[in-house]
Amino acid sequence: AVVDAVTGTGFHGQFRANARLAAQQINRAQGFVLALDVPSGIEADTGRAAEDAVRASLTVTFHAKKPCHRLARQHCGEVRVARIGI
């Protein structure tokens, strides 16, 4: 299994070089990919995907779903909300 936490909810645009390499390696990994909050390379508010955005098997998001969980469904996989007391 791979845990994706390269970028977060503040991501916009395209990856920088090292982040792109990390996302490419995650996408090449065999097996389960868990994204924390938002898959890397996905804009939380718009669902826009950067080139090489991570494709997760499961996304665990915190407090509530974000627009990208609906708009970029193909990158998020199953989405579960973790209640964190906010």
Please provide the spans of the model-predicted regions.
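YjeF_N-associated NAD(P)HX repair module
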Residues: 1-86
